[in-house]
């Protein structure tokens, strides 16, 4: 038996010891024409979707399914567009394990690499994290249907369930689910953003977003301009240089790089667990301040790029315009004019539920923060205003009261929950607290919906003990 197999047995034994209460408590339901109705459908099989499934399974919700558009165990960025070498989160994180010591990343890593290996490890390599998530899925028996894309959701009041088109290999089938969890990651409440003034000015083969597939080999000997100073901008700059780019110039608006990490400040129980318990004004003040402080590149990421002679920083250099000048890209910045052969856009993502195909029919009914709260002028932030205004357990709320009450059975466990509930929807660091909050909401919602049936079950209970 391999060390990983022995650890998997230990995990299952630990779960058996903690399995009370074991009785199944949800009655299977079908549609009027006999099609099974899932208790929960989870869209997204990355770390958030898998941990949500595990949390529900521990609460005896087993009639569930996780779908993901990617191949099995390739959900999330780790084996695709993530170009960092390691996670940015410190290795001592916990969260997906849900309090099971044998299921922690440390237990798994030490089982594979031996005693003392954890102490020698700095940050967790991204490929190692992907391997851990695969072990997690296999050990827990989480039902995942890969290469399956969820279409536009619609609520069916007659069935008291969501209709979800699931497309797989060109074939679309309609699934029904009492509850749906969207665990679609950082872009799950919007999409990656390339400003129109860039996409309108350049041919498609002359620019890419950090999220895009990039043929870095084609950049050998070329001049690359990177817009943005976040971690992913530095990751892509370093990758281009490692593939032989002649030079990479990184441009950003601030007068100097951010070198204080507000996310490290936030790593304490009060903020991670209880931001969602604050009032709207306090939530807005905290999150807008974190965003205003900015995102820095981790020290290792900065060194990875700056060790190359061809790497140049341009602070105070917001881009004013750009255009093709023959075969060259001409860039006008606040610090002067520059030229490049290729542009990498590191401007992150935009929050806008209108960009989510699965919410196409629902977006007009979903409450946003701009519908519920007006911040002081000094704290105004357009992107925050577009964040969904979520309930206490990541559920959507209705924009007009009474118009779409069914939205309370649809959960947004994505980065879009940042303003309402803090880190957690797509963040490893907040998962320890966000997962129980989500699971509590779903189990409570299902129990309330079935309350009368449970009461009738109690009245009919007649198991004599002597």
Ranges and model annotations:
Residues 84-115, 264-278:
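Flavin (FAD/FMN) cofactor-binding and adjacent substrate-gating region
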Residues 48-51, 79-80, 94-95:
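Generic N-terminal leader segments that precede the first folded domain
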Residues 73-83:
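Core mature regions of organelle-targeted
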Residues 1-70, 75, 118-243, 249-466:
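Flavin (primarily FAD) cofactor-binding/catalytic cores of flavoenzymes
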């Amino acid at each position: 038996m391999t060390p990983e197999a022995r650890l998997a047995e230990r995990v299952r034994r630990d779960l058996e010891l903690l399995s009370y209460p074991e009785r199944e408590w949800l009655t299977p339901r079908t549609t009027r024409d006999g099609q099974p109705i899932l208790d929960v459908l989870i869209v997204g099989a990355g770390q958030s979707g898998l941990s949500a499934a595990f949390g529900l399974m521990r609460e005896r919700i087993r009639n569930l399914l996780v779908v993901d558009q990617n191949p099995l165990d390739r959900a999330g960025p780790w084996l695709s567009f993530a170009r960092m070498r390691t996670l940015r989160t410190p290795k001592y994180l916990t969260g997906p394990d849900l309090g099971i010591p044998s299921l922690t990343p440390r237990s798994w890593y030490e089982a594979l690499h031996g005693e003392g290996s954890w102490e020698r490890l700095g940050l967790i390599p991204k490929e190692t994290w992907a391997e851990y998530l695969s072990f997690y899925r296999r050990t827990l028996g989480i039902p995942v249907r890969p290469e399956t894309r969820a279409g536009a959701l619609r609520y069916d009041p007659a069935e008291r369930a969501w209709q979800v088109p699931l497309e797989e290999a060109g074939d679309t089938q309609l699934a029904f689910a009492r509850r749906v969890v969207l665990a679609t990651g950082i872009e799950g409440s919007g999409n990656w953003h390339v400003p129109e003034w860039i996409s309108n000015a350049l041919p498609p083969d002359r620019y890419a977003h950090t999220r895009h597939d990039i043929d870095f080999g084609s950049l050998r000997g070329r001049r690359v301009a990177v817009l943005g100073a976040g971690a992913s901008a530095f990751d892509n700059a370093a990758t281009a240089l490692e593939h032989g780019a002649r030079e990479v110039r990184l441009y950003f608006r601030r007068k100097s790089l951010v070198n204080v990490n507000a996310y490290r400040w936030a790593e304490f129980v009060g903020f991670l667990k209880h931001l969602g318990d604050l009032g709207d004004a306090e939530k807005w003040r905290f999150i807008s301040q974190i965003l205003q402080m900015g995102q820095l590149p981790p020290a290792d990421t900065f060194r990875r790029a700056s060790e190359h002679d061809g790497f140049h920083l341009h602070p105070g250099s917001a881009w004013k315009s750009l255009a093709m000048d023959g075969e060259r890209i001409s860039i006008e910045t606040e610090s002067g004019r520059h030229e490049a052969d290729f542009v990498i856009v590191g401007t992150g993502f935009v929050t806008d539920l209108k960009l989510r195909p699965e919410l196409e029919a629902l977006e007009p009914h979903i409450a946003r923060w701009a519908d519920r709260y007006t911040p002081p002028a000094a704290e105004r932030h357009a992107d925050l205003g577009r964040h969904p205004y979520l309930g206490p357990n990541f559920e959507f709320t209705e924009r007009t009261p009474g118009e779409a009450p069914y939205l309370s059975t649809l959960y947004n466990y994505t980065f879009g929950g940042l303003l309402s509930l803090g880190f957690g929807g797509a963040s490893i660091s907040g998962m320890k607290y966000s997962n129980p909050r989500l699971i509590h909401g779903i189990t409570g919602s299902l129990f309330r919906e079935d309350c009368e049936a449970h009461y009738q079950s109690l009245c009919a209970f007649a198991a004599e003990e002597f």
